[in-house]
Amino acid sequence: MVLLLTVARPGASHAAWSMHAGNAQHTALSTVPTQPLQAVHWQTPVDLKPQYSGDVLYIHYGSPVITEANTVILPVKVGAADTFRVEARRGSDGLLLWQLPTDYQPPPHGWVPSVGLTLAHQGRVYFPGAGGTLLWTNGLDTPSAHTAVRAAFFGNAAYASNPAAFNASLRVCTPLTADSEGTVYFGVQAVIANPLGITNAIAAVDESGVGRWVSVGAASEGQAIQVATNCAPALSRDEQTLYIACRGNSSTPGFLVALSTSDLSTQHVRPLADPATGLSANVSNNGTATPMVAPDDKVYYGVLENPFGVNAQRGWMLQFDAALNPAGAPGAFGWDHTPSLVPAAAAPVYSGTSSYLIMTKYNFYAGTGGNGENKIGLLDPLVAQVDGFSGETVMKEVATILGATPDPDAGPSYPTAVKEWCINTAVVDPFTHSVLAGAEDGKLYRWDLATNTFSETLVLTPGLGEAYTPTVSGPDGQVYAINNATLFAVGASNVGVLPPGPDVRALELGTLTPNPFTMRTRFSFRLPGERHVRLEVIDVAGARVRTLADGTFDAGEHWMEWDGRDGARHASRAGVYFVRLTDGSSTVARRVLFTP
């Protein structure tokens, strides 16, 4: 059923980048076309006291998140030691709107762990605090003084009874992941004993501040000891299952666990094995590997090989079904990276049968068995080939592309070596058939999936201090990349600074209500003038599920609803979808969860 009603009241806002890799499935899909990589619009430091070791920064900078009204919220390291604050900046020009300190202390580490924020549907941003707690604030787009509210997964009263003891003991150790109802999931390390006897744990806090947790030992059925540092929890498309990696006190043994989001009870535990040797795979606390959940409910997760180095330090990208059974050949590179999802329709170079492909870092490190020919790759999860280095059966390479900048530091033994790809997530833009990623050479690239070329390159820095970092896109199509401890906002050279407040010339897509929904959800869109628009429902792979409208509409607001059915009027599967509005030159989208 599609219901149309024209009224004349203001519309609502645009799409957002909500957490690590964009969403709770970590697919890194942009919901709007990205701007051309032509100019730096603004920049701001994400580390006020970067600690260089030579020209290297041993830190994983956390991902910015971006609200629907285009406010960019980012974690900022403020001291030489591990001290942080959160800043909110206007996406159009980088103007500082507000900032808040956090008393967060990361767990013991080699590389400084990422400080991972998440947006929640009730207009909040959550960020880690001391003692395993979360801090949140709202009014995110308002330039005013903000205060933080604390939420302890073990109860605020318990925390208040002895904050010093909990601060000394408990450390949030992963980026935060929020579901569509505002519950936030994360991992916790207990570095010393605490008054409640809480051990290493997987925790959740709902929007009312009520928490729950399960020990890693219980979650893994007695097999693991701690959550892997930097592993952002991933949610199934229906948000009924949480996936997270755990490990022993050292990097082995490693496990992937699936928990019920309702009570954190264990559904499945999968020991992670090196596909070549059969030994337990390495799960490193110095990496950033995070599960990615695909539209067919497969789970992809990257590990290091065991023994270390036998696969040229590339690791493996493992794939599992929803119950964590092995479900296909591994990718030949996996560790320190969250794979991105590329809809097959967004990759004209592809002619196979899979509905999606896997975009991955594909480095081949010099001096570790590789030749330094560092690439990024596009893999087919349904088809296999023999890897030229290991001789193992791996996911088929649909396309790969070599980094553009020679690496003389690799030495004369590696004349074809190039600078490596320093990314822990990329951005996939299905509208322009491209992937956006940064490299160690200080440049931001657009990889054109129609021509298998770098169609755009923008120099951000001379290539100094390139820590492993995320790439992010905003609701206006602006692209964000971190290079040399600085966040760069990148886009078209002819884009001027926008005034504060809504752009009256823009398309606007209202909030979907209810969300999640079981029968139907209602929403509005607003047009600044008469124009031809298309309104579609798409799935997380970018495939069209249903066209709700395709025609010319008058200026003003138009109300519609979606009943959860596809174009053939069949009931859609439970999961996350996007309602997308486009007029041919601009696009806005809203996320919705269907739970029939």
Regions picked out by a protein language model, each given a short descriptive name:
Residues 1-4:
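Sec-dependent N-terminal signal peptides
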Residues 8-10:
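N-terminal signal peptide c-region/cleavage motif recognized by signal peptidases
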Residues 13-59, 66-74, 78-112, 118-127, ...:
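Extracytoplasmic/lumenal domain signature
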Residues 76-78, 248, 524-529, 539, ...:
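Non-cytosolic beta-sheet module surface loops
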Residues 498-538, 559-562:
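Glycine-centered coil/turn sites that cap beta-strands in beta-rich domains
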Residues 516-518, 528, 553-555, 567, ...:
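Surface-exposed coil/turn segments at beta-strand junctions on protein surfaces, enriched
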Residues 538-545, 577:
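Short, glycine-anchored, charge-dense loop/turn motifs used at functional sites
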Residues 547, 552-555, 559-561, 570-596:
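C-terminal tail/sorting-segment detector
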